[in-house]
Amino acid sequence: MTQQFYVSPEQLMKDRADFARKGIARGRSVVVISCEEGIALVAENPSPSLHKIGEIYDKIAFAAVGKYNEFESLRQAGVRYADVRGYSYDREDVTARGLASVYAQSLGAVFTAEQKPFEVELAVAEVGGNQSDDHLYRLTFDGSIADEKRFIVMGGQADKVAETVEGGWQQELNFAGAIRLAMKGLVTDKEAGELPASALEVAVLDRASESTRGSRRAFRRLGDDEIAALLSKEN
């Protein structure tokens, strides 16, 4: 007769959490920084096509670490949610807080009910009219949600990267300064003094997109040449 093994709910949840954390720890870090000109999103990502950063809606962006297929499915679901809500109600009704709540419900349901949890950590960012109106939300594998201030760091070396970003963050940072600060954090654990532009994925949420580009869409992805030029600028 086969012996049945009992696993307590506490142990089951702990095992699931440990499993998810190990998967996330293998991922390269992502930094999201609120600055004077908007919000900068910087990821260590040598792939030119498998993006860890993406646009969700007019002033909302998404960043993630972990398993690509899992966070990409969440990004696509977020885009569909935003499009439907904006069409059904009003574009102003699509907010980072609403999207983060939807993600939290999905992650929490998978963590408790499915065979395995998602090995992902997410950031949802919304740029405001001024820096105090920016919204940064961090979501973990179990559906926990945190309203962060100034910056978010995710990934395997998050603590070390966050220490560097914390020490260099200033309210007056422009995009160039924020991107350089993020890169400085990302190379904290590396022998090389800097990462090449081709190893970085960078996007911004431009606070002044309507006045400078005549567009509600604040999200803009930077190419290698523009990243290299920004990294060489004096703040």
Curated annotation (Swiss-Prot):
Keyword set includes Ubl conjugation: no
Annotated Gene Ontology cellular component terms: cytoplasm; proteasome core complex, alpha-subunit complex
Keywords: Cytoplasm, Proteasome
One Gene Ontology MF term: threonine-type endopeptidase activity
Description of how activity is regulated: The formation of the proteasomal ATPase ARC-20S proteasome complex, likely via the docking of the C-termini of ARC into the intersubunit pockets in the alpha-rings, may trigger opening of the gate for substrate entry. Interconversion between the open-gate and close-gate conformations leads to a dynamic regulation of the 20S proteasome proteolysis activity.
Listed pathway(s): Protein degradation; proteasomal Pup-dependent pathway
A single GO BP: proteasomal protein catabolic process
Keyword Nucleotidyltransferase found: no
Pfam families: Proteasome
Localization of this protein: Cytoplasm
PROSITE patterns documented for this protein: PROTEASOME_ALPHA_2 (PS51475)
Function, in words: Component of the proteasome core, a large protease complex with broad specificity involved in protein degradation.
Complex and partners: The 20S proteasome core is composed of 14 alpha and 14 beta subunits that assemble into four stacked heptameric rings, resulting in a barrel-shaped structure. The two inner rings, each composed of seven catalytic beta subunits, are sandwiched by two outer rings, each composed of seven alpha subunits. The catalytic chamber with the active sites is on the inside of the barrel. Has a gated structure, the ends of the cylinder being occluded by the N-termini of the alpha-subunits. Is capped by the proteasome-associated ATPase, ARC.
Family: Belongs to the peptidase T1A family.
Name listed for the protein in its UniProt record: Proteasome subunit alpha
Organism in which the protein naturally occurs: Arthrobacter sp. (strain FB24)
